A protein has these predicted regions:
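Positively charged n-region of N-terminal signal peptides that target proteins for export
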Residues: 1-7
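Bacterial N-terminal signal peptides
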Residues: 7-17
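Zymogen propeptides
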Residues: 20-118, 136-137
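Extracytoplasmic
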Residues: 52-54, 87-88, 122, 153, ...
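Short, solvent-exposed aromatic-acidic interface loops
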Residues: 71-74, 139-145, 190-194
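General beta-strand structural signal in soluble alpha/beta enzymes
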Residues: 92-96, 129, 217-221
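Active-site-adjacent helix-turn-beta-strand microarchitecture at beta-sheet edges
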Residues: 99-167
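Conserved, well-ordered active-site substructure
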Residues: 103-121, 167-174, 179-221, 225-256
Length: 256
């Protein structure tokens, strides 16, 4: 078979599968520890609108926990995620919610059971840990009850109950959080690439067999210059800096 014919057949096969079927095989998960996996993904071509370079952590809830990090707990209004992660003695961290001028948090924050910032009436999502289980809900579903140890309000939501939502046509650097069907937590940042929110929703929604993250629910966190990720644990080292410090983030801790 000629090189030209092989190229034509490969092109047709990619069109027939939506252009993303190779992602799962080409970018396998790397096991860092029991319950902690990492992968770096580069996706280009249909059905995505732009090149995406993604850094992703998948966190098993039985072995690890996720907690909200607040810079004010360390005496400052903002910190780079690298510094905040280290200060909190987390093994990994990403940036969190929106903020006002002066780096004042915008939206609900609950840190280790204490409300650090009030709920905002907005069409956003809330990541929370209630009764030691992770959830993503809409603002209107929130009830200030007991047994909520962590909460972060931000948005928009990308996937709801396994359904990909329609996003505004906006492009930026992105940070996002998702929950898989197995209650694993996904932490994702883009690296050196601007991404459409719809493409991000699509990859969170798609099954793993088609190169996706197979999430039941997912939401965007603050993006643009706020986007950043840091991890230092065993053989894993990630350092994706942002454009400025942030008031809060999401940290990963090993259960004892």
């Amino acid at each position: 078979m000629s090189v030209f014919l092989r190229g034509v057949l490969l092109f047709l096969s990619l069109l027939g599968t939506g252009g993303h079927s190779l992602a799962s095989a080409d970018f396998p998960w790397q096991k860092i520890d029991e319950g902690l996996e990492y992968k770096s993904v580069r996706v280009d071509g249909l059905p995505y609108q732009t090149l995406m370079k993604l850094t992703i952590l998948r966190i098993g809830w039985e072995q690890f926990q996720v907690r909200i990090l607040d810079s004010r707990d360390h005496g400052v209004g903002r910190m780079e995620i690298k510094a905040l992660t280290r200060k909190a003695q987390a093994l990994a961290g990403i940036n969190g919610g929106f903020f006002l001028p002066g780096y004042r948090p915008l939206g609900l924050l609950i840190v280790d059971g204490k409300e650090a910032n009030p709920l905002r009436k907005a069409d956003w999502g809330i990541f929370l840990v209630q009764d030691n289980l992770p959830r993503i809900i809409h603002t209107t579903e929130y009830q200030n009850g007991r047994n909520i140890s962590q909460a972060l309000q931000v948005g928009p939501r990308l996937v709801v109950n396994g359904r990909e939502l329609q996003m505004k046509k906006q492009i930026a650097r992105r940070t996002a959080l998702g929950l898989t069907l197995k209650n694993q937590v996904i932490l994702l940042t883009t690296e050196d690439t601007d991404v459409y929110a719809q493409d991000l929703a699509h990859i969170f929604h798609l099954p793993e067999a088609r190169g996706g993250l197979e999430c039941r629910d997912a939401m965007a966190l603050d993006g643009g210059p706020s986007t950043q990720m840091y991890a230092e644990y065993k053989d894993l080292k990630i350092d994706i800096p942002g454009g400025w410090g942030v008031p809060n983030g999401v940290g990963v801790f090993k259960r004892r």
